[in-house]
Amino acid sequence: MYIRKTLLLACLVLLFGGLPPLTFPATTTTLVAAMSIANQDLERYFRPGNGTHSFSGMEDRIAVDVYNYAFLNWSYVEHGNMLCNMEFAQEQARYGEGKVLNVTGRLIHITATDNFSDDYACTPYIRGTLGAPIPDKGETWIALVRRGRCTFEEKVKHVYQQNAAGVIIYNDKQVMQLEKMQIKGKTRNIAAVITYQNIGQDLSLTLDKGYNVTISIIEGRRGVRTISSLNRTSVLFVSISFIVLMIISLVWLIFYYIQRFRYMQAKDQQSRNLCSVTKKAIMKIPTKTGKFSDEKDLDSDCCAICIEAYKPTDTIRILPCKHEFHKNCIDPWLIEHRTCPMCKLDVLKFYGYVFLGSEESILEYQPDPPQGLALVEARDESADLNRSRDFVVDFPRVFVLDSGCVVGAREMLFPCRIPERSQSSLSLRQARDWVSLMSNKLEEQQGLRSMRNDEMQQVIK
């Protein structure tokens, strides 16, 4: 019992005092940063850029979005040998996951083998601009692919299998900000960038007109951008959910152990009460000292429990069923089993203790006397019965009834305190029914005894 209390207290201490606070800024920011930049090359993304940028410690970073932008510069020769160069002052593309490379090569508008208008590169069977063959392996070329219909990973894989040095994926709709492409194969030696829809359409139209376009993918600015609001909300939601679940589990655990403790306490109390009643019944069982050879039978010359012969100095207890045992042998047996080891006679029932559904609800009544008692003893018992017809019912408290009225207190059946709410399975109405039944039984016994007394008096006269 005390061990159970100690374990419960230890659980409470570990839950409230042993766990680190979930709302500390350092712990929260570190957790979110670790979740957000998983599988990234930290040494590359967080090293000082050009000696002018540096990042604080991990504990100062919240949720971050690592970005690498790229410049797209291209040129082509128009009709009349006029060179046209397109250069932008700001980055117009963004690298996806994987290697960040600077590449210059011939731009090829990817088409499907069976459909020259399909430029999604969602199949490994691809060709060049308007169905032209793919450049040879020794030539450096860059693929132009439209976004959609399949994942970025599939598009990059298909053009990489055709020995492309880079791939430009342009959006299929207008967007304000370029997102980061999720690519599984981060070790491929290919520069994969995503650009805006208008730039991709201009490049595809230029290629479809038959111009040879040379394009360069040049690394631009890079760094991290905090997106703390979304991640803080997520962490707060997860933390609150975890705390609520822990509180619910803790309340249920406390309630469970309280109920279990009350049940065990009531069970121990009932066991002690039953043991006390059993000891009272044992005190009523007669004993004798020794058993001489002239009075012992062949079948009862030894104790059935210890299998040892009776000696003149032994204390022998005689049960109501006339079976005899050593006092030191039968008393522990009766306290535990409350029955005769040989014939299973219920000793408590014989001496007037009846169970009413549980060990706590016990009815004590005056049993019928044995047939072999003398007439004088029967007369005395009848007189005692006339003087007192008391019932002691321990449900939920001990009370005394005399002819249906409460007359006063009697020695309680159990010396220990009875709880306010009984754990018995019987209701008070059922207990009253038992009292009424036993009262009727005793009235019948009293009537029979009165008739016997009258007959005995007539015989004596």
Curated annotation (Swiss-Prot):
Q: Which InterPro entries match?
A: PA_dom_sf, PA_domain, Znf_RING, Znf_RING/FYVE/PHD
What is the official name of this protein in its record? E3 ubiquitin-protein ligase goliath
Intracellular or extracellular location(s): Endosome membrane
UniProt pathway annotation: Protein modification; protein ubiquitination
Could you tell me which residue ranges are on the Cytoplasmic side of the membrane? 256-461
Q: What are the BP-aspect GO terms?
A: mesoderm formation; protein ubiquitination; ubiquitin-dependent protein catabolic process
Q: Where do the ZnF regions (RING-type) fall?
A: 303-344
Q: Does Flavoprotein appear among the keywords? A: no
Gene Ontology CC entries for this record: cytoplasm; endosome; endosome membrane; nucleus
